[in-house]
Regions:
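Nucleic-acid substrate recognition interfaces
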Residues: 1-333
Length: 333
């Protein structure tokens, strides 16, 4: 489908409207595949082209890597073709598969679609999408505010003076992971030992990812429970990672993922995630007297002001973000 779309675009400069049904005669094995899964692939492909036509900067749709792309497919619930019962999941053109259910499904929820994915470690996951009533609470009056500033070490610092204390899971496991990756590089590609070692490396990465997500879920839950509004900087994390060569550190603490978790947890409770403009000089302004320094290098970890204020620069920035967040809230309210 993509090859035909590319060819048609090169000739006509338009998107070809082709469907999976038109290829089943030429490729009979497509009849063995769930037709709704093929339809979802078609929708994803058309969406990629529409986005390209709207925003050429995103790039022309291209072929996905066979080795490194995410292995998944999505199917839809139509006329009871998907069944979830007694710890078994029945998908179209498949026998019922025993599953470990993450949580019980409330009554009244309607199953809409299922996305099945395979992790590099060989584990399979099914993400179930349900249609339900709006679970978001009504917005409440914010009384308890918290300022939060991004930090390379510990993930973030709060206006209370506390640090998140993120354990840097990837950094701690880096030596062990490097040793296992060296073993993998010495194995003959495609051999049984290569596959075993590849799975072992994938399990290390999966463990690090799960540790990170567990820490972030617990912290974001705690903040969403304790505060009515959390004020953060709207940072360009990709720019920081590339421009300041902090890529590995930022990817390790997963600050962007943490903000996403915190955002939806606050929204579910009718609370607020207030984003302060990224160009707001939170680090240069004194949180006590309001004086703004002309220059402040990254090596200066203590903020010193002529008024006598002596404070950790990250805590000082978090207090300034808190004040600016309160101002934005009052203005919008």
């Amino acid at each position: 489908m993509l090859a035909d779309k590319i060819r048609h675009y090169q000739e006509e400069k338009k998107m070809l409207k082709n469907t999976p049904a038109g290829y089943k005669k030429e490729y009979p094995w497509l009849k063995e595949v769930d037709s709704l899964a093929l339809a979802n692939v078609q929708l994803n492909l058309e969406g990629a082209f529409r986005k390209f036509f709207r925003e050429p900067g995103v790039g022309f749709p291209h072929y996905k890597s066979k080795k490194h792309s995410r292995k998944s497919y999505t199917t839809n619930m139509v006329n009871g073709n998907i069944c979830l019962q007694d710890r078994f999941l029945k998908l179209p053109k498949m026998q019922p598969v025993k599953i470990k259910l993450h949580r019980m499904i409330p009554e009244g929820w309607k199953l809409k679609s299922v996305t099945v994915s395979r992790e590099p470690s060989g584990k399979y996951f099914a993400s179930l999408l349900f249609d339900c009533e709006n679970q978001t609470a009504e917005k409440r009056q914010a009384e308890k505010f918290l300022g939060m500033d991004f930090a390379m070490h510990g993930m973030c610092v709060f206006s209370t003076g506390e640090r998140a204390g993120y354990p840097m899971f990837y950094r701690n496991a880096e030596k062990k992971l490097a040793r296992e990756q060296r073993k993998l590089s010495r194995c003959e590609k495609g051999s049984r030992n290569y596959q075993k070692q590849k799975k072992k490396v994938a399990l290390y990465h999966e463990k690090i990812k799960n540790q990170r997500k567990d820490f972030q879920h617990k912290l974001s839950y705690s903040l969403a429970e304790d505060y009515d509004a959390v004020c953060v900087e709207d940072l360009n994390l990709k720019g920081i990672a590339g421009g300041l060569h902090f890529g590995k550190g930022i990817q390790d603490n997963g600050y962007g993922q943490f903000l996403s978790m915190l955002g939806y947890k606050l929204e579910e409770r009718g609370k607020y995630l207030i984003k302060v403009d990224r160009y707001f000089a939170s680090s240069k302004i004194c949180s006590v007297c309001g004086h703004k320094k002309k220059e402040l290098t990254l090596s200066e970890r203590i903020y010193l002001c002529e008024c006598g204020n002596r404070m950790d620069r990250d805590v000082n920035a978090a207090v300034n973000i808190l004040k600016e967040g309160k101002r934005i809230y009052k203005k919008c309210a």
